[in-house]
Amino acid sequence: METLQNVVTGGKKGGCTSGSRPLRILLVGKSGCGKSATGNSLLRRPAFESRLRGQSVTRTSQAETGTWEGRSILVVDTPPIFESKAQNQDMDKDIGDCYLLCAPGPHVLLLVTQLGRFTAEDVMAVRMVKEVFGVGVMRHMIVLFTRKEDLAEKSLEEFVTHTDNRSLRSLVQECGRRYCAFNNRASGEEQQGQLAELMALVRRLEQECEGSFHSNDLFLHAETLLREGYSVHQEAYRCYLAKVRQEVEKQRWELEEQEGSWVLKVLPIGKKLEVLHSDFCWYLVLAILIFFVFFFLLFYV
């Protein structure tokens, strides 16, 4: 297991050299969605603790390594940091450790969600992913549906195309229609086949991004900290966690600003005129009040 201590003491992830172009995959999504089981399917071994229940087993970020067709793969599993109730005193540490394990940045973020169960919690998880990693993170996102076996005779494309879940349709569009499905109980040829399908999507994504990975200021800070070497008890680590808090807050503000701008763009012209008219009315009322106050002061005081 690739622990945080292995990383902070200068160990290289999986013993990979820079020339081997290791693929870094970050698992994201709401608690209990099957991230750990998906990680095990990716690595084709029980690397992460996984149980068949709707609650998260993973308590801290964990990285495991494997290979696919000769290429080294680093898979990072995440604790419950992508939900509104996850705001607690350990949040900064959980996010900071996730950045450290995935530095200098992930090539792919796998958003794991259960087939036919994309709920408000999943929508919140997507928003939290943007807050934690920045608004540009969707450029490197692939949606991965678990419970592929539930499709029965229907194809995944049919399911996605004809779903009446608007939030899911919007997400798929935002991710450039990059999606696939896993049966995490599969083995042998079935497991190999679904993994090959995902890796084909990964190659397409890497071509679109010209081989780049997702990065931001916080990943640069994490990389610097790793390069310098440190202890989790040192002042440098505490300063890093303070930076985590600042950067996530900044990214949250940028997301809210972007959403506000988007709302104005998609408002119908009539609605925009209503907003403008409403603002004008308020200014008119304010101007009249000021006039009467000035008139009263001028003639009666």
UniProtKB/Swiss-Prot annotation:
Transmembrane annotation, as ranges: 280-300
| Location relative to the cell | Endoplasmic reticulum membrane
| Stretches the record annotates as Required for targeting to the endoplasmic reticulum | 263-301
Q: Which Pfam families does the entry mention?
A: AIG1 (PF04548)
| Gene Ontology molecular function: any one | GTP binding
Locate the residues binding GTP. Answer: 29-37, 50, 147-149, 184
The residue spans the entry assigns to the Cytoplasmic side of the membrane are as follows 1-279
Does the record bear Phosphoprotein in its keywords? no
Q: Which CDD domains match?
A: AIG1
Q: Name one GO biological process term.
A: mitochondrial genome maintenance
Q: Which ranges make up the Lumenal topological domains here? A: 301
This protein's GO cellular component annotations are: endoplasmic reticulum membrane; mitochondrial outer membrane; mitochondrion
**What does UniProt note about where in the body, tissue by tissue, this protein is expressed?**
Expressed in thymus (in thymocytes), spleen (in splenocytes), lymph node and, at lower levels, in lung. Highly expressed in T lymphocytes.
| Major subcellular site | endoplasmic reticulum
Q: Which InterPro entries match?
A: G_AIG1, GIMA/IAN/Toc, P-loop_NTPase
Query: What positions does the domain AIG1-type G occupy?
Result: 20-223
Q: Cytoplasm: present as a keyword of the record?
A: no
Induction summary? By BCR-ABL oncogene.
Task: Report the membrane topology from the UniProt record.
Answer: Single-pass type IV membrane protein
Q: What's in the keyword line of the UniProt record?
A: Endoplasmic reticulum, GTP-binding, Membrane, Nucleotide-binding, Transmembrane, Transmembrane helix
The UniProt family comment states: Belongs to the TRAFAC class TrmE-Era-EngA-EngB-Septin-like GTPase superfamily. AIG1/Toc34/Toc159-like paraseptin GTPase family. IAN subfamily.
Role description? During thymocyte development, may support the positive selection of CD4 and CD8 T cells. May play a role in mitochondrial DNA segregation in hematopoietic tissues. Binds GTP.
Quaternary context = Interacts with BAD, BAK1, BAX, BCL2, BCL2L1/Bcl-xL and BCL2L11/BimEL. The interaction with BAX is increased, when cells initiate apoptosis upon IL2 withdrawal.
UniProt-recorded name of the protein: GTPase IMAP family member 3
Q: Which organism is it from?
A: Mus musculus (Mouse)
